[in-house]
A protein has these predicted regions:
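ATP-dependent small-molecule kinase catalytic core of the GHMP/sugar-kinase superfamily
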Residues: 2-45
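Residue-identity detector for glutamine
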Residues: 12, 24, 37-38, 86, ...
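Structural signal for interior beta-strand "rungs" in well-ordered beta-sheet cores
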Residues: 46-178, 191
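Terminal amphipathic alpha-helical/low-complexity segments used for targeting or macromolecular assembly
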Residues: 40, 161, 167-168, 172-216
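Flexible, glycine/proline-enriched loop segments at strand-loop-helix junctions
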Residues: 1-2, 78
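Generic secondary-structure transition motif, activating predominantly at the C-termini of alpha-helices
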Residues: 15-18, 29, 60, 195, ...
């Protein structure tokens, strides 16, 4: 085994550990006796002024001032909850998710993620967009106040802006738009199905992800 405890070891690890972390880090590497006293734990960060209900799990992510996060919610690795954003209960923010914040003007609307929603990895939701209860947002979806959120499940498309309806399953898409230089594809979001409201939430979510092959 290689003992850790010097500054060089910290550079190799890329992060620091606290004294209460189990001594085994990875096969072949263990902390030297007393080394934990020299190291500092780096957990997720909730800034002073944020409110997290009991039972919130924050991986190495960040919750900014004024944000509200409900019980049972997971803020996964490198996910960011912006200032004054409102995250409901039992929400899952996957790795790298960006939830936009707003401090001013005071009349601006914060991003709201309602209870039970699932936000896939690297999704970005900003400018006061609201995600309805138990909606599923696929990986890499970008939602702004002006993003066209197009329901393509019926014979005619239905366009939403600023709000994802409850239990909607959303993936990235594009639509044609004419410019002086020609016609180009611009980003949009597509509602491709509905998460069942009549079955257990967890079972329903897993089935939706399979049925629609939604990347998360």
């Amino acid at each position: 085994h290689t003992a850790l405890g010097s500054p060089d070891d910290l550079e190799q690890l890329g992060f620091a550990l606290g004294a209460d972390v189990p001594s085994q880090i990875r096969p072949g590497r263990v902390l030297a006796p007393g080394a934990g006293e020299q190291l500092e734990r780096v957990p997720g960060v909730a800034r002073y002024g944020a409110f997290l209900e009991r039972g919130v799990v924050v991986m190495p992510g960040y919750v900014n001032i004024g944000a509200w996060v409900g019980a049972g919610t997971m803020v996964d690795t490198w996910a960011t909850v912006g200032s004054c954003a409102q995250i409901g209960r039992n929400v899952h923010l996957s790795g790298g998710v960006g939830i936009g914040g707003v401090l001013e003007p005071s009349t601006a609307t914060p991003v709201i993620i309602e209870d039970g929603a699932f936000i896939g990895s690297r999704a970005v939701i900003v400018e006061g967009v609201q995600v309805g209860e138990e909606a599923v947002i696929g990986a890499n979806v970008v939602l702004t106040a002006s993003t066209h959120i197009i329901d393509v499940t019926g014979a005619q498309e239905v366009v939403h802006k600023g709000r994802v309806p409850p239990r909607s399953v959303v993936i990235p898409g594009s639509r044609a738009k004419k410019f002086p230089a020609g016609e180009y594809q611009v980003p949009c979001a597509l509602i491709i199905g509905q998460r069942s409201a009549t079955t257990d939430s967890k079972t329903s979510l897993n089935q939706v992800l399979r049925d629609f092959a939604v990347p998360v």
